[in-house]
Amino acid sequence: MGDFIGHISPGLFLVFYGLYQAVIVSRAVIFNDSLLYPSYLSKNKGKWARLWKIAHAGWLKVVIGSLLIVYEISCVKEGLTLMTKGVPPRFMYPKEWQHLTMFFLLTLDGCVEMVSKNVLRQRCVLLERGATVLGVYVLLLLLVSHVKESSGVELQVHSLLILVVFLLMLVLTAELWAPEMFHLWMIETFLILIMGSWLIQAAFILFRPVSGFPWEDDDISDIMFVTTFFCWHVMINALCMLGIYGVSSFWHRCYSPSLRPMGSKEALYQESSSGTFYKLLQEAEQQDKDDQAPLLSKISPCDRA
């Protein structure tokens, strides 16, 4: 799958997945809501309630992973075999088998998420995050061995990708102990966006250069500009996340003014409810006293005795 489609397809998936997660994280930060158990899922009681509770990200991972597996197998015209029939036997298509391993782990991650959210009686967050961490660990190992035969521009492109995957591995490992920390989720989303956009950029650098001329491995300027482009991707994705947060905040404040940050919403509701009840109780007691005052004034002292 070392072609244009093989790089741009996973890149597009990661970009759209990162944008989706950026919206989810922005909403959770704005309303101080839970990232793993958002309140809008429990409050949705309509006919679409079950649809909202479906593991959309899990289904997406399964579908994309399966399609990439089919595409990888179809790219080998002679048939994807593991070893030659000669003596001694030799392994065949090492990079293709590495790609299949990556896509299989992506599909497995989606299946685990679906089972945890929609099959098990009680959701197991540790199982979900563990499957994701396993996939990223294996991805890092495969990428390190994937660039053994690379050099020049291709080596620089994949080295920067390995750097992003390594940082993502550290963040996901930390999330095993702090699954609800907003900062870790924001960094994770940021790294996923960088990983996706850089894969798209890599597809054009390695296979379809915009200039129409291939990049030169012996030209130090080309290698330096690979790093420059990567830094631009970092800045653009940071601005993208900031823009998503700003638009989400503006939308919820202007078009949903009745909504409040979820962290203090229940407290405000209880406080207002108890305060209103206490005020009504005082008014009722005062009205009873006012009604009883004329009756007491009509009773003579003899009657009282």
UniProtKB/Swiss-Prot annotation:
Keywords per UniProt: Glycoprotein, Membrane, Transmembrane, Transmembrane helix
Subcellular location: Membrane
Membrane topology qualifier: Multi-pass membrane protein
Disulfide-bond pairs as recorded: none
Record flagged with keyword Lipid biosynthesis: no
Positions annotated as glycosylated: 32
GO CC, one annotated term: membrane
Family: Belongs to the TMEM45 family.
The protein's name in its UniProt record: Transmembrane epididymal protein 1A
Organism: Mus musculus (Mouse)
